[in-house]
């Protein structure tokens, strides 16, 4: 049974009438451009065919009822006329409440709604299940009540909800790609202007995500340290963000910087340049060049930004040995575990899967999870 059928059937059973709309919003993977978002730089994600789906209908009062199919059909109810505060027990409900609350601040011309939510974006894998949920809820209200909001505004609303209501720091990339993703394309995003450019993906190329299943422990504290180091670098150059520093300016005075800060800055500057070039390489179908850029990105994350772990490096090496110069592979996400992303011709999928199955657990003692994805459409009706 599809997620659409599941949520529609549950909606009718739970609420006693049929849903009027079913909305989806996808998860995402970032192909290249790591830790560049909070430096006002560039990222190149694509939406994937794992999504959050919501069957819904407007109500003629001011009540919101939400059922979470993936959490034992837990039900949350709240009123649009009372202050919206955090739910004491259901963490999932706070993503919904946060989106609704922040949407009220933007445009209060919507009424009540009934929703049933289900999703298949793997949680905790760095594939943005939370952003997918936020964008789906925002799109539900926009569609049911014809709110004059575009995808970027729905994305910004989701980011605000996560930062301010849920209390989790995140950049804008995850929500933006979920809202604006385009089938068979990646999206080059300028994280300063929020300008986007759709980049066509070569035909017959698989987007493969492999979860190392290495439990991330350092990610919070180390993430904040990296942000501070980048801000220190920007201050040294008297610029608002590292986006505004050229590699030539950096090379001329790198020796004056603290050696660790210099390494962090070098990663951001070179990663930004790689990301812009990667968009061109993809558009031209040049998988060999894309592979070189992804390899450089991984080496930079490993050696200059120091956010990879041995298990991730091992996974990358296993995949690279199979695909050679026919594609690329690198760590994706915040670091210290999580996933790798690989782009290569579809016909190599079985060989890559076999090599990883035979070697990764033997070398690390951990079993991987393997996802073959398609670049997918952003949020909308399904």
UniProtKB/Swiss-Prot annotation:
GO CC term, one of those recorded: cytosol
BP term (GO), one: galactose metabolic process
Protein's recorded name: Galactokinase
Catalytic activity, EC: 2.7.1.6
Residue(s) at site: Transition state stabilizer: 28
Residues noted as binding substrate in the record, renumbered to the chain: 34-37, 223
Domain of life: Bacteria
Catalytically driven reaction(s): alpha-D-galactose + ATP = alpha-D-galactose 1-phosphate + ADP + H(+)
Keyword Iron: no
Binding residue positions for Mg(2+): 130, 162
InterPro entries in alphabetical order: Galactokinase, Galactokinase_bac, Galactokinase_CS, GalKase_N, GHMP_kinase_C_dom, GHMP_kinase_C_sf, GHMP_kinase_N_dom, GHMP_knse_ATP-bd_CS
Source organism of this protein record: Escherichia coli O6:H1 (strain CFT073 / ATCC 700928 / UPEC)
Cleaved signal peptide residues: none
Subcellular location: Cytoplasm
GO MF term list: ATP binding; galactokinase activity; magnesium ion binding
Gene: galK
Residues at the active site: 174
Protein residues bound to ATP: 124-130
Pathway noted in the entry: Carbohydrate metabolism; galactose metabolism
Family recorded in the similarity comment: Belongs to the GHMP kinase family. GalK subfamily.
